[in-house]
Amino acid sequence: MIVLDEQLLSYGLRALIARWYRGTVTDITQLRPNTVISDEAIPPLLRAAPRPTFVTINVTDFWRRVVPDVRFCIACFAVPHTRAEEIPDLLRRLFALAPFRTHSQRLGKIARISQRQV
């Protein structure tokens, strides 16, 4: 399951990722509908979801701030919102790397991804 941060909803990323990702692609607001979700509430929501990979551009609040957990993966994309359309390709490249190829390999990891490095 791929879970998009709510700040990525207006970019059409769900459909772009769903073109190549075989599992569920959703957003964080679907995990707790009709509520405001603070950044602090996201890890507990991810723990309750089935093997999620959370995708965000909010590097400041998630990279090296959230404690890794074997029940989820967080992919922090260090790209400005004006380049959010690059995220599906970067995510696909991330999933091609050995430590991220399968759910079981990526769970428990928090990655910071840019155009140049993971």
Question: Which residues fall in each region the model found?
Answer:
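A short beta-strand-loop structural module common to alpha/beta enzyme folds
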Residues: G23-P33
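Short helix-initiation/N-cap motifs at beta->coil->alpha
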Residues: R32-A41
